[in-house]
């Protein structure tokens, strides 16, 4: 309206009318603008109140979110610490399990090697048994020639006495070792329930050898043997002071078996000679009565000699079977070891 051109008036009345109408229009526009301003102010006040309310709510929500954020940060930190702790524990447990697995594999390999050695030892024992059977058969064939060697048997009788001295000493030491082994087994009974039980075969073998020596009749010690066998100081079952190798254990058992077989052979020879002497004395009709009575004593000695010979001919393998040791492949399958035994030193 400011740029509106003022028209040219022909008369003052037209000019008055024009300006009156212009004043009315301006007044009307002013009134409308004022109403709009009032309405706008009311709307702005309402909007401002609403915005204030929304601002308060937003600030409250923001404070809540900040507190939640802080709480969640604390929880995240605690969870991170727990996760790190759990990860450390898991890593440690995995390391322990890997170490146990490595030890178990090592023990498994050692047990496989030990089983192979036992199988080889069983094969050696079987061959020794067959060789012993062959030698016994050969000895039966040459038994008739042994009658002419009575003088030599007297010297072998002295050797028998020295061997019996060694056997008696072995029996005493075996009894002491068995008592010590029983004490140590009772002491270690609590720690013997988690490991495999197959390596107890050495203990069974040693026990069978000791039982074989204990099955002989006790003979009083009359002489001292210069070249007697000196047994080991500890049983090689993992509880002694110095565990022996499998070859040393097998050699010790072979020595004990040879001693037992040698004693049995000597006793059988002595019994055969006494039986022959008794038969020769009974065939002579002019033999005095005193000799007959002494022949009765000789028969008693022969009967005792036969008993000794039977005990001597009970081989190491038979005694092992009686005492609970049954070599695989010779007398059948080996019975399972007790589940509470610890593995022996390999």
From Swiss-Prot:
Residues 188-200 have a biased composition (Polar residues). Residues 184-205, 325-346 are annotated as: Disordered. GO terms for cellular component: centrosome; cytoplasm; microtubule; spindle. Its main location: cytoplasm. Keywords: Coiled coil, Cytoplasm, Cytoskeleton, Microtubule, Phosphoprotein, Transport. One of its GO terms (biological process) is positive regulation of ruffle assembly. GO terms for molecular function: microtubule binding. It comes from the Eukaryota. Residues 13-190 form a coiled coil. It is found in: Cytoplasm, Cytoskeleton; Cytoplasm, Cytoskeleton, Microtubule organizing center, Centrosome; Cytoplasm, Cytoskeleton, Spindle. Phosphorylated in mitosis. Residues 335-346 have a biased composition (Pro residues). Required for organization of the cellular microtubule array and microtubule anchoring at the centrosome. Positively regulates the activity of the minus-end directed microtubule motor protein dynein. May enhance dynein-mediated microtubule sliding by targeting dynein to the microtubule plus end. Positively regulates lysosome peripheral distribution and ruffled border formation in osteoclasts. Belongs to the nudE family. PANTHER family: NUCLEAR DISTRIBUTION PROTEIN NUDE HOMOLOG 1 (PTHR10921), NUCLEAR DISTRIBUTION PROTEIN NUDE-LIKE 1 (PTHR10921:SF0). This is Nuclear distribution protein nudE-like 1.
């Amino acid at each position: 309206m400011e740029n509106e051109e003022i028209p040219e008036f022909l008369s003052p009345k037209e000019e008055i009318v024009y300006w009156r109408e212009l004043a009315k229009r301006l007044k009307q526009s002013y009134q409308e603008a004022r109403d709009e301003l009032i309405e706008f102010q009311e709307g702005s006040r309402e909007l401002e109140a609403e915005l204030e309310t929304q601002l308060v709510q937003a600030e409250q929500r923001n404070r809540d979110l900040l507190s939640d954020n802080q709480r969640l940060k604390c929880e995240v930190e605690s969870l991170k610490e727990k996760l790190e702790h759990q990860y450390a524990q898991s890593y440690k447990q995995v390391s322990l399990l890997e170490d146990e697995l490595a030890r178990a594999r090592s023990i498994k390999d050692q047990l496989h090697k030990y089983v192979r050695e036992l199988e080889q030892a069983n094969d050696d024992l079987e061959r020794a048994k067959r060789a012993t059977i062959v030698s016994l058969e050969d000895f039966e064939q040459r038994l008739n020639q042994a009658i002419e060697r009575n003088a030599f048997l007297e010297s072998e009788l002295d050797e028998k006495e020295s061997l019996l001295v060694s056997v008696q000493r072995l029996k005493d030491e075996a009894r002491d070792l068995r008592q010590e082994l029983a004490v140590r087994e009772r002491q270690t009974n609590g720690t013997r329930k988690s490991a495999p039980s197959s390596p107890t075969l050495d203990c069974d073998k040693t026990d069978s050898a000791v039982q074989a020596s204990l099955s002989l009749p006790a003979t009083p010690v009359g002489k001292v043997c210069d070249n007697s066998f000196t047994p080991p100081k500890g049983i090689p079952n993992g509880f002694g002071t110095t565990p022996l190798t499998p070859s040393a254990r097998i050699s010790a058992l072979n020595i004990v078996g040879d001693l037992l077989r040698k004693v049995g052979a000597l006793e059988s020879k002595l019994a055969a000679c006494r039986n022959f002497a008794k038969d020769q004395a009974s065939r002579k009709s002019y033999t005095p009565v005193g000799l007959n009575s002494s022949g009765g004593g000789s028969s008693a000695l022969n009967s005792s000699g036969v008993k000794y010979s039977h005990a001597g001919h009970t081989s190491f393998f038979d005694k092992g079977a009686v005492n609970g040791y049954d070599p695989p492949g010779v007398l059948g399958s080996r019975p399972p070891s007790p589940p509470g035994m610890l593995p022996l030193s390999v």
